[in-house]
Regions:
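Hydrophobic positions on the alpha1 helix immediately C-terminal to the Walker A/P-loop
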Residues: 56-60
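Conserved glycine(s) of the Walker
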Residues: 52-53
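Short hydrophobic/aromatic beta-strand immediately N-terminal to the Walker A/P-loop
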Residues: 43-46, 73
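Short, mixed-charge, low-aromatic patches
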Residues: 13-20, 41-44, 86-90, 94
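Core recognition of P-loop NTPase motor domains used across DNA-transaction enzymes
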Residues: 1-39, 110-113
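Cytosolic-facing regulatory segments adjacent to core modules
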Residues: 32, 67-131
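The conserved Walker
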Residues: 49
């Protein structure tokens, strides 16, 4: 079936005059212009190995968690759970792990545990078993 041209024009005017609800932003124009968090959307990030996909996604997840109190379930089959936790800790503190005091690690990891759940990758799970 073909798109109804009248409806298409109406949608374009809705976009032009900001009548379409926007996803959550980070208040960074250079990011928000291209990427917003939309609840219920399913996004996939693909690319060659060792190009920074996981790092970028974790950074964005941390930024959205800090700004909007979002919570995440992370499955990353190519990365260990402790390497994910380390990146999250370093992103949250802005400090390499070797320079973070133990007491701060304890506090920050409580917050991280509240906002990020990591799926162990030592075996495969069904969607039902994760719920």
């Amino acid at each position: 079936m073909l798109t109804d041209f009248k409806i298409l024009k109406e949608k374009l005017y809705d976009v032009k005059y900001d009548r379409i609800e926007q996803g959550l932003g980070l208040d960074i124009d250079e990011v928000d212009q291209y990427l917003r968090y939309k609840k219920g959307a399913f996004n996939i990030c693909v690319g060659h190995a060792n190009t920074g996909k996981t790092t970028v996604i974790l950074y964005l997840q941390m930024a959205y968690s800090l700004k909007h109190d979002l919570k995440w379930l992370i499955f990353s089959s190519e990365n260990s759970d402790y390497s994910i936790a380390r990146k999250l800790l370093e992103f949250k503190t802005g400090t390499p792990i070797q320079k973070i005091p133990d007491s701060q690690i304890e506090t920050e990891m409580e917050w991280i545990n509240d906002h990020f759940k990591l799926v162990k990758v030592d075996k495969l799970y069904s969607a039902r078993s994760l719920m």
